[in-house]
């Protein structure tokens, strides 16, 4: 089976050097799993039945994106088809910052644009 594809969503809205991390996303569907999202700021995960919805928000600019699991799958399929175009960066783990791993960087603005193109 294929490995999970690891992403990090980052926002470049503030004046600080470097981008703010909005969320860590592990697309475990290639390995037979699910999409996992984690964040350490302004993040909501709602589950009902077999449905999951996340709300990602930048703490600096307050831009937010509500994403259902089905919409997240469509967005990640689009980014996954162009992995070679995404920048890769070594990012500290959401749960244990002493661990760092390579992740494909999705700009928060690009995620929000793709979300609006899909209609929600």
From Swiss-Prot:
**Species of origin:** Mycobacterium tuberculosis (strain CDC 1551 / Oshkosh)
Name-wise, this protein is Uncharacterized protein MT2734.1
Going by the entry's taxonomy, the superkingdom of the source organism is recorded as Bacteria
């Amino acid at each position: 089976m294929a490995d999970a594809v690891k992403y990090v969503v980052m926002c470049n809205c503030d004046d600080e050097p470097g981008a703010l991390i909005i969320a860590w996303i592990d697309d475990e569907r290639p390995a037979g799993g699910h999409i996992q999202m984690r964040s350490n700021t302004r993040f909501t995960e709602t589950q009902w039945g077999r449905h999951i919805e996340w709300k990602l928000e930048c703490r600096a600019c307050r831009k937010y994106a509500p994403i259902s699991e089905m919409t997240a799958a469509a967005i990640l399929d689009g980014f996954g088809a162009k992995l070679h175009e995404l920048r890769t960066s070594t990012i500290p783990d959401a749960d244990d910052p002493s661990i760092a791993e390579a992740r494909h960087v999705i700009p928060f603005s690009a995620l929000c644009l793709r979300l609006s193109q899909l209609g929600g």
